[in-house]
């Protein structure tokens, strides 16, 4: 059993699974490399806003007063984003729709909104990807992505009740989505990771750009790809000490690295370890094994316990009544295999 003291750092990952209709999922880690799902892998919050009622790409930011603010993609083709807040990541406020692109009747979408709190100005930046036909420098597209040419837009707020006018945030010479910002604690500048979304020829890779101050914007001259010859998206940058980790979705392979199975685009963020401990300890919201597990049998091999059973839940296996395997080192924290 790990003893954790107040003031120590732990890490949370907000994410969605499958089609995102079941809502917000959380995972935790103490080192940024080994992650376990909370709440037995079940959702903490079911989406209730937007025409499709999705909760894709949940981005969470903790305010100086301890409140957690979250924004998310509510639809594939909507001009709003979802918003809710919480003091404990378990009980959430009424969900709201922020009409960030309602003033643009031709806007196709509002994808992957992200939150960043700028300490010097005590201001929250919310930024996302939108296509507005004819608005941006044209790029060649594949037939399947015809008409999609994204740029990053943003609004600011101090209270999540009033918002600035929507403005352009990042306008490179390529279609761009999935922007995510993290502060470098050593250099004290800001790093933004973005996806080059060009489809003809396909790029589908992650690039980096840096700035000293967010209000001055980010250079549109970006780095060479930091990912390999596979399609990547959904970057989630996180500093663990002086080391920068960038988690991302190898979406054609249907996997993230070093995180729970089935995870999709979200945000990694640091919290006081006591917050993670309270989430783990709350058995009302974190059962050892999710509901609907039948005929359990446990065996131990080496230092690992394996629990075998059948389930009616869909873990991406495609059918009910499928045999499943969970494993644990301590008989308390179980991960799905």
Predicted regions, residues:
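Carbohydrate-active catalytic/glycan-binding domains of CAZyme proteins
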Residues: 1-337
């Amino acid at each position: 059993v790990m003893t954790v003291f107040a003031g120590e750092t732990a890490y949370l990952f907000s994410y969605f699974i499958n089609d995102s209709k079941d809502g917000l999922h959380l995972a935790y880690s103490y080192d940024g490399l080994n992650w376990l799902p909370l709440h037995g892998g079940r959702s903490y919050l079911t989406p209730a806003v937007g025409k499709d009622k999705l909760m894709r790409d949940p981005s969470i930011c903790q305010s100086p007063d301890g409140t957690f603010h979250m924004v998310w993609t509510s639809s594939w083709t909507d001009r709003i984003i979802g918003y809710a807040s919480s003091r404990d990541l378990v009980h959430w406020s009424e969900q709201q729709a922020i009409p960030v692109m309602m003033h643009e009747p031709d806007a196709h979408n509002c994808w992957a909104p992200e939150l960043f709190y700028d300490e010097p100005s005590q201001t929250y930046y919310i930024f996302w990807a939108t296509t507005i036909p004819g608005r941006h420098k044209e790029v060649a597209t594949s037939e399947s992505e015809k008409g999609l040419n994204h740029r990053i837009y943003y609004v600011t707020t101090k209270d999540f009740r009033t918002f600035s006018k929507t403005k352009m945030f990042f306008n490179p010479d390529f279609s761009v989505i999935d922007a995510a910002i993290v502060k470098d604690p050593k250099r004290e500048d800001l790093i933004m990771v973005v996806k080059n979304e060009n489809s003809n020829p396909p790029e589908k890779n992650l690039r980096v750009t840096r700035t000293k101050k967010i209000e001055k914007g980010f250079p549109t001259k970006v780095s060479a790809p930091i990912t390999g010859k596979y399609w990547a998206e959904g970057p989630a940058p996180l500093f663990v000490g002086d080391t920068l980790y960038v988690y991302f979705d190898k979406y054609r392979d249907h996997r993230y690295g070093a995180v729970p199975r089935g995870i999709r685009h979200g945000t990694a963020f640091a919290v006081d370890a006591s917050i993670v401990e309270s989430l783990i300890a709350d058995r009302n919201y974190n059962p050892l094994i999710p509901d609907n597990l039948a005929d359990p049998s446990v065996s131990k091999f080496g230092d690992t316990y394996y629990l075998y059973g059948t389930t009616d839940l869909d873990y991406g296996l495609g059918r009910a009544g499928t045999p499943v395997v969970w494993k644990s080192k301590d008989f308390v924290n179980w991960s799905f295999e």
